[in-house]
Amino acid sequence: MPLVKRNIEPRHLCRGALPEGITSELECVTNSTLAAIIRQLSSLSKHAEDIFGELFNEANNFYIRANSLQDRIDRLAVKVTQLDSTVEEVSLQDINMKKAFKSSTVQDQQVVSKNSIPNPVADIYNQSDKPPPLNILTPYRDDKKDGLKFYTDPSYFFDLWKEKMLQDTEDKRKEKRRQKEQKRIDGTTREVKKVRKARNRRQEWNMMAYDKELRPDNRLSQSVYHGASSEGSLSPDTRSHASDVTDYSYPATPNHSLHPQPVTPSYAAGDVPPHGPASQAAEHEYRPPSASARHMALNRPQQPPPPPPPQAPEGSQASAPMAPADYGMLPAQIIEYYNPSGPPPPPPPPVIPSAQTAFVSPLQMPMQPPFPASASSTHAAPPHPPSTGLLVTAPPPPGPPPPPPGPPGPGSSLSSSPMHGPPVAEAKRQEPAQPPISDARSDLLAAIRMGIQLKKVQEQREQEAKREPVGNDVATILSRRIAVEYSDSDDDSEFDENDWSD
């Protein structure tokens, strides 16, 4: 049904009942028709005033917009004509301080509303009957709904359409989120292909170059070929040959290199350092051929040995600092190297379980009781690191002064005082009881974690702000639905906990 915006009254000129007692009926009808025409002319003039008033307002708006546009054009023309790029330079600060121009297109929304209703329509609306005053019952309702909306609700159809559009938009968003999760699950359950192992062609050709009789052991070649992983770790076969050097040793430092360092063994009065076939037999008895050959290759003489230092009196503890020794070297080899010639050796030393147990760290090896001074072979006992142990020896004959102590290393502080297992363990137990020390790195880590939490809260607030309806009009709702349908990424998805995890 078309809405009549302007209606000229009266619509009928000659229709009307004549009053009784009129002698001249023709004259009465003529006068009433003329009066109706005058009323129509007055109504027409009123509508004309409204029409020209609206035209004037529209023209005034166009004039104001044209003037503002002309002012901007004039200012731009002045800047363009007077700008000299060789002399005047635009600073980056000025560019960043000013916002770029953005056109704001205002779409026509809610054309038929109470604010935009024209005057003639407002007059017609005011002439209609008023609805019953049902709004006075609103305070007595439990659901707090407006009582008048049950009788007449101008926004009923719009609210119904809005609810339907928002529901469709939410359904599409959930469908896209479900498809995204399905793709993620399908991507994680795909078959994992096995990576082919790399072949060492050079090693194979080197093995083929040997004759079958001279070819190395097959087990050793396989361990060399297959033992090294991508990180460079050794297999158990190859690691077994280097265990005597690597196990029970201090971390690699300049003081603990592969070359032998000067060692000063302690001897009792009248004792002679052993050398010769007996010590070699003891060495070969407890070490495999491969390990002994490896140690003979590593323990080449690099410098002449220094003389032994004078010993402390009997019953005192060894407090003189000693140079760090290479623990990959057996005591028999050390004594044999430092004493190429001398008196006949004493009887062979007692049997020890293995070469590795002789070099147990001082924290793991229990303390041994001191031997009497009359013992014929003090040095034949199971050896232990030179930084530990209590040696009860007789005063040695006067000799040259002891060598200067080596550079401070991991073992220098240990050799200055006797070591005992229980006090060190107690100190280790007391360390966790100390309060944590706050430094710059811990503060930085705490600041980073706080920043991550703040970022999570900020993103959650942004997501909540996006979920709220921006506008209550048709254009905004439709644009939001189109954006959800044609967007590739799910911008309105829930916050992912995998991002910025601790």
UniProtKB/Swiss-Prot annotation:
Biased composition range(s): Low complexity: 411-423
The keyword Coiled coil is annotated on this UniProt entry: yes
Chain coiled-coil ranges: 57-93, 162-206
Database matches in InterPro entries: SCAR/WAVE_fam, WH2_dom
Chief localization: cytoplasm
WH2 domain sequence ranges: 440-457
Molecular functions per Gene Ontology: actin binding; Arp2/3 complex binding; protein kinase A regulatory subunit binding
GO CC annotations on file: cytoskeleton; extracellular exosome; glial cell projection; glutamatergic synapse; lamellipodium; postsynapse; SCAR complex
Basic and acidic residues composition bias: residue spans: 182-192
GO BP annotations listed: actin cytoskeleton organization; actin filament polymerization; cytoskeleton organization; lamellipodium assembly; modification of postsynaptic actin cytoskeleton; oligodendrocyte development; positive regulation of Arp2/3 complex-mediated actin nucleation; positive regulation of myelination
Chain's role: Downstream effector molecules involved in the transmission of signals from tyrosine kinase receptors and small GTPases to the actin cytoskeleton. Plays a role in the regulation of cell morphology and cytoskeletal organization. Required in the control of cell shape.
Family statement drawn from the similarity comment of this UniProt entry: Belongs to the SCAR/WAVE family.
Name this protein carries in UniProt: Actin-binding protein WASF3
Organism: Homo sapiens (Human)
Lineage: Eukaryota, Metazoa, Chordata, Craniata, Vertebrata
